[in-house]
Curated annotation (Swiss-Prot):
Family per similarity comment: Belongs to the PAPS reductase family. CysD subfamily.
InterPro entries: PAPS_reduct_dom, Rossmann-like_a/b/a_fold, SO4_adenylTrfase_ssu, Sulfate_adenylyltrnsfr_sub2
Function summary: With CysN forms the ATP sulfurylase (ATPS) that catalyzes the adenylation of sulfate producing adenosine 5'-phosphosulfate (APS) and diphosphate, the first enzymatic step in sulfur assimilation pathway. APS synthesis involves the formation of a high-energy phosphoric-sulfuric acid anhydride bond driven by GTP hydrolysis by CysN coupled to ATP hydrolysis by CysD.
Subunit structure: Heterodimer composed of CysD, the smaller subunit, and CysN.
Organism of this sequence: Aliivibrio salmonicida (strain LFI1238) (Vibrio salmonicida (strain LFI1238))
Protein name (database record): Sulfate adenylyltransferase subunit 2
Biased composition regions of type Basic and acidic residues, renumbered to the chain: 280-302
Pathway given in the UniProt record: Sulfur metabolism; hydrogen sulfide biosynthesis; sulfite from sulfate: step 1/3
Length: 302
């Protein structure tokens, strides 16, 4: 197909499918991270397209912290059953035994033990040499400078000064024994691109992205949804019901909602057209300290 005749979204789709196929052909044991969010849903859709009518030739991996929204887990299991892909779910057993909680131990320690260490455990356990992730460059400044092929050493750490040039959509996937890469097929997409593609391709998403009246607590300027009985209220806090939706999804105590009436995809797209902030502003883990995300990525986080 003539690239000049492709729409903007078709060009992004073609680029992403090319990257997914390249990795599947070049690496021995790839895996696709499945965080259940909108970007993961788009990436899964692209992987299905890349190998249609065949089955996706690698498993999907969800690192479960035990603190995801209930609707996320329900959606994950329903989606795996619907499409029949190989789904691996990993929880850090040491973290579970320690009873790690974002309420008790804070966002930084919770993220390190349950997400970063849990991810590294799963990658080591299965010997994966390439892991797809749904991160985009427009989300956050450390992700903006990350390559499509993001090289990691034997400890899964990221050195932004030790990455390879990617000229003319050519990727060098050569790694030494014990090294691996993280791959980001959606690097050049924006949040608006994601929503427009979801709408045009009729991709299923977690209902939490759509506005609805839900129980929330206003904590330090963030609207935290009360998702289960483990929600710990601080002195002076009270539960209110507000029309909210989520621009990003993670562990429920660490993910802020936005007040919104947008309960259809066209209404969400309309909101995105006038949005002036990144969706990551609703993630508490990004505000632990200055450069917080880059520090986490250097330690092995996605």
């Amino acid at each position: 197909m003539d690239a000049k005749r492709l729409t903007h979204l078709q060009q992004l789709e073609a680029e992403s499918i090319h990257i997914i196929r390249e990795v599947a052909a070049e690496f021995d044991n790839p895996v696709m991270m499945y965080s259940i969010g909108k970007d993961s849903s788009v990436m899964l859709h692209l992987a299905r397209k890349a190998f249609y009518p065949g089955k996706i030739p690698f498993p999907l991996l969800h690192v479960d912290t035990d603190w995801k929204f209930k609707e996320m887990i329900e959606f994950r299991d329903k989606t795996a059953k619907k499409y029949g892909f190989d789904l691996l779910v990993h929880k850090n057993p040491e973290g579970i035994e320690m009873g790690i909680s974002p309420f008790v131990h804070g966002s930084s320690k919770h993220t390190d033990i349950m997400k970063t260490q849990g991810l590294k455990q799963a990658l080591n356990q299965h010997g994966f040499d390439a892991a797809f992730g749904g991160a985009r460059r427009d989300e956050e400044k450390s992700r903006a400078k990350e390559r499509v092929y993001s090289f990691r050493d034997k400890n899964h750490t990221w050195d932004p000064k030790n990455q390879r040039p990617e000229l003319w959509n050519t990727y060098n996937g050569q790694v030494n024994k014990g090294e691996s890469i993280r791959v980001f097929p959606l690097s050049n997409w924006t949040e608006l691109d994601i929503w427009q593609y979801i709408y045009l391709e009729s991709i299923d998403i977690v209902p939490l992205y759509l506005a609805e009246k839900r129980p929330v607590v206003d904590r330090d300027g963030m609207l935290i949804m009360v998702d289960d009985e483990r929600m710990e209220l601080k002195e002076g806090e009270k539960i209110e019901y507000k029309d909210i939706r989520f621009r990003t999804l993670g562990c429920y105590p660490l993910t802020g909602a936005v007040e919104s009436k947008a309960n259809t995809l066209p209404e969400i797209i309309e909101e995105m057209l006038v949005a002036t902030s990144s969706e990551r502003q609703g993630r508490a883990i990004d505000h632990d300290s200055s450069g917080s995300m880059e520090q986490k990525k250097r330690q092995g986080y996605f």
